[in-house]
Amino acid sequence: MQRCSVVAALAGVVFLAQACSLSTPSRITHTDKLPVVVTFNALKELTQMVGGEKIHLVSIVPDGVDSHDFEPKAKHMAFISDAKVIVYNGLGMEPWIHSVLHAARNSGSIRVEAAQGIVPLKAHTRGHTAHHVHAHASHGSAYDPHVWLSVCNAQTMLRTIGKALCKADPQHTRFYKRNARNAAARLEALYKEYRSKFAALSHRYFVTTHAAFGYLCRDFDLQQKSIKDVFNTEEPSIKRLVELVEFSKKHSVRTIFSERGPSEKVARVLAQEIGASVETIYTMEKNEENLSYYERMKHNINRIYRACSKQVTPSQ
């Protein structure tokens, strides 16, 4: 994406938003519920857990569009201008967000960086050129943005979102606090269940197409081997594929994890080479098979555990 295109378009977008403000049926001001805008699916799910029926929730990044590459249109600016609470991930996941927030001129809104309070992991930039790495770093992407894929981080995010909703809508404070507490407790139970299961394994590594699961690895002391790095932007080199084939054969890897989409093709090539199967893993950046956040998180953890439990000690 050409980053300057977002900035260049903002003036026109704001003009269009103002011009359409009286006629656009998708404005969210005319509701008794608290108007909340989030950037993408995982944040929508987490915010809905807390807000329930008390909020009117809009997610602005469409399914199938990468949050990094999203370019806001007039209707998105209108939503942001109307919102009382705006939830975004941070850590460079939405490099356009601060320009958009400034252009929206909604100074009365509560703006929530969901990654706040989470210790970030540095992004591994294997295979990137110095120019490419610098470009990511200049947009705040020196760190891995995929904080929502951690069952522990998600609990922090729920509390952060809950505090914002309570501040924006104090009359429903008890409702938001209870929902945040219950959702976090459910995730904590999932964490405790699999923490003991993973601890009993001798081998805790898995192979995936996209290095998006560093925070989940931190939860359970796992190690991910990936075809592409955290930015998921460059095609893997032959050298990298050979390394993964050798690693997978040495450690009896029988599962290659992949998001649905173009990544599945290279995953199948690697799986065929080592005699493994390909299993779906969810990144939760978009709606995936109409599964909830909790269902996808449990799926990911369970499938990784099953894959790790099949591994054997490599022969010397």
UniProtKB/Swiss-Prot annotation:
Gene3D superfamilies: Nitrogenase molybdenum iron protein domain (3.40.50.1980). Belongs to the bacterial solute-binding protein 9 family. Keywords: Metal-binding, Periplasm, Signal, Transport. Part of an ATP-binding cassette (ABC) transport system involved in metal import. Binds a metal with high affinity and specificity and delivers it to the membrane permease for translocation into the cytoplasm. Residues 1-19 form the signal peptide. GO terms for molecular function: metal ion binding. One of its GO terms (biological process) is metal ion transport. This is Putative metal-binding protein TP_0034. GO terms for cellular component: periplasmic space. It comes from Treponema pallidum (strain Nichols). CDD domains: AdcA. A divalent metal cation binds at H68, H146, H210. PROSITE patterns: PROKAR_LIPOPROTEIN (PS51257). Its main location: periplasm. The keyword Flavoprotein does not apply. InterPro entries: AdhesinB, Bact_metal-bind_prot9, Lipoprotein_PsaA-like, ZnuA-like. It is found in: Periplasm. Pfam families: ZnuA.
